Swiss-Prot record:
This is Amino-acid acetyltransferase, mitochondrial. GO terms for cellular component: mitochondrial matrix; NAGS/NAGK complex. Residues 1-14 form a transit peptide. Residues 368-534 form the N-acetyltransferase domain. N-acetylglutamate synthase involved in arginine biosynthesis. One of its GO terms (molecular function) is L-glutamate N-acetyltransferase activity. Pathway: Amino-acid biosynthesis; L-arginine biosynthesis; N(2)-acetyl-L-ornithine from L-glutamate: step 1/4. GO terms for biological process: L-arginine biosynthetic process; ornithine biosynthetic process. It comes from the Eukaryota. Belongs to the acetyltransferase family. It comes from Eremothecium gossypii (strain ATCC 10895 / CBS 109.51 / FGSC 9923 / NRRL Y-1056) (Yeast). It is found in: Mitochondrion. The gene is ARG2. Its EC number is 2.3.1.1.
Length: 542
């Protein structure tokens, strides 16, 4: 039914809804996989469930009339996709003016809206939203005012994080998306040349990202206050002020995301982007793209290949030669960060699995002669076997497998309650071992959601960034995804010289080194091929 609504239009009569449908279909056809399209239609096509997205606007007064006009059009497109928008303004002395500008612009585009200037009553924890009618066809424009009963006075919220935390906690509706739209875009990343982080797993990265931003703010503040820079302030002072504002607002945006997403379901998604990107009329519109696919515009686990020694640019995330990186903040790919509350991550770096550091299959394990580790530090081999078999749809011979990997385990990565796993071993010559991804599995119903695959590959690339190899069957449908994350790929049946050629059903993938120099070391290549090619699978023949 939803596809039928999107596709139905009169030939030769291009109404605004026709243009909206064409754009949405362009995004859906060019970016969404079959599974994503099915998931989207199943989710938002159900009339019994109403999904809402909160759009938090920062710096609305600074946006041009054209941008506000395009924003109203974008809200109409979001509603066409089956998600209901609620607009929240950030604290500012201009909120009343901003609210009126939005209301008038929405009205011009046939959108009904209602300004709400007392969304909460401080002390009673009751929201006016709870007492109001259901906003099925009306867009609330929520102003950040708090009514203090003791003072009998309405006041602008001083702490926007606390305001949003309380507002969202008592909203009587299902919030599926939380979008922050500002002037500068997503959370800046030094690894991306100060363009935005692609994806942030808050449960894993929030603390470190917040500390980095705080340190950058402190360092920049010292530079701005340093008397030695007085003579330079005339030339670069305004730029440093711009940097300072960007960093402080980015820190607040990160805190807002953490506070709000922690109150929502784990499947909920956050997104931070600039207003220019949010209203772009292309298939790379980050808001439409995320509603349709629930992921970022580019994958966060793609490797940073170096384009040239001067610009040090990465092929997948930086502009073409000659373009200025600073101007890319207006490009959705460079100015958008997608965030999830995320899942717990555990890393077990036991070289050998024993009865003391494992749960299950103790009859196959030896004892280390030490005290048993706490439950959270033990690898659950029963669950490990379960996810591998569920993912590969094959039976794993645990006796054969444990004999093969024990004593040379590099790391075991576990996501959540064994919803995603990676088992890495050290293979190769004793004096020159290399990290090998032996098993990689994600529960079938979670593939593509929560960005589990990207999280696992990012962890592996950070931990084994100099050298990592894995293999995959030639006909594996995931090989294109693997290829995008590798420096190179070889067929394991090729003639490597200095040894017999063997028929093989696998391809070898390699990641490592900023320039992939090891891949031109033919002696090392022979070692990769020889050792990886001859690894015996541990599948049961039953």
């Amino acid at each position: 039914m939803l596809f039928r609504r999107l596709l139905t239009t009169k030939v030769g009569y291009h109404t605004p809804n026709y243009v909206n449908r064409r754009l949405i279909l362009s995004v859906l056809k060019s970016t969404a996989t079959r599974r994503e399209a099915k998931d989207y239609l199943t989710k938002y096509g159900d009339p019994a469930v109403a999904y809402h997205c909160v759009l938090y606007l920062r710096g609305t007064k600074t946006f041009s009339a054209g941008l506000i006009n395009d924003f109203a059009i974008m809200l109409g497109r979001l509603r066409l996709l089956g998600i209901r928008p609620l607009v929240v303004l950030s604290p500012s002395k201009h909120v009343m003016t901003e609210s009126e500008i939005l209301r008038e612009t929405f009205y011009k585009h046939g959108l009904q809206s209602i300004p709400i200037n007392e969304p909460m009553a401080s002390g009673t924890r009751e929201t006016i939203l709870q007492n109001g009618a259901s906003y099925n066809s009306i867009i609330p424009i929520i102003m950040p005012f708090v009514y203090h009963q003791q003072r009998a006075k309405r006041m602008l919220a001083e702490d926007e994080v606390a305001f949003m935390r309380e507002l969202v906690a008592y909203m009587p509706c299902r919030i599926d998306k939380f979008f922050i739209i500002n002037r500068y875009g997503g959370i800046p990343s030094s690894e991306r040349h100060d363009n935005s982080h692609v994806f942030v797993n808050l449960s894993q990265e929030y603390g470190s990202l917040a500390e980095v931003l705080k340190q950058q703010i402190t360092d920049l503040r010292h530079e701005m206050d340093d008397g030695l820079l007085a003579e330079r302030r005339a030339t670069d002072g305004s730029y440093k002020e711009f940097q300072y504002t960007t960093l402080t607002e980015s820190l607040t945006d990160l805190e807002l995301m953490s506070a709000v997403l922690s109150l929502l379901l784990p499947s909920s998604t956050g997104l931070i982007t600039s207003m220019h990107s949010a209203v772009t009329n292309s298939r790379y519109n980050p808001l439409l793209y995320n509603v349709l696919t629930d992921r970022s515009l580019v994958s966060s686990s793609l490797p940073s290949f170096k384009r040239d020694p001067i610009s040090d640019n990465a092929w997948y995330e930086l502009p073409a030669c000659g373009a200025k990186i600073g101007t890319q903040r207006a490009n959705p790919i460079f100015s958008t960060t997608v965030l999830k509350q995320g899942v717990d991550i555990k890393l077990y770096d036991y070289s050998t699995l024993t009865k003391e550091n494992s749960v299950g299959f103790h009859e196959l394990l030896s004892t280390a002669g030490s005290a048993q580790l706490p439950a959270h530090k033990r690898v659950n081999l029963t669950k490990l076997k379960g996810i591998i078999e569920h993912s590969f749809d094959r039976n794993l011979d645990m006796s054969h497998y444990l004999k093969r990997i024990n004593g040379k385990i590099a790391s075991i990565i576990v996501i959540g309650d064994y919803e995603g796993i990676a088992i890495l071993t050290y293979e190769g010559p004793e004096k020159r071992p290399f990290a090998y991804l032996d098993k990689f599995a994600v529960l079938p119903h979670l593939r593509g959601s929560l960005c589990i695959s990207d999280v696992i590959f990012n962890l592996m690339f950070k931990k084994f960034g100099d050298e990592l190899v894995w293999r995959s069957r030639r006909e594996n449908v995931v090989n294109n995804w693997y290829f995008q994350r590798s420096v190179g790929v070889l067929d394991l049946s090729i003639d490597i010289g200095h040894g017999p050629k063997k028929d093989n059903i696998f391809k070898l993938f390699y990641y490592g080194g900023k320039k992939g120099t090891q891949f031109y070391d033919f002696d090392r290549l022979r070692e990769y091929i020889t050792y990886v090619r001859d690894i015996e699978p541990s599948w049961s023949r039953k």
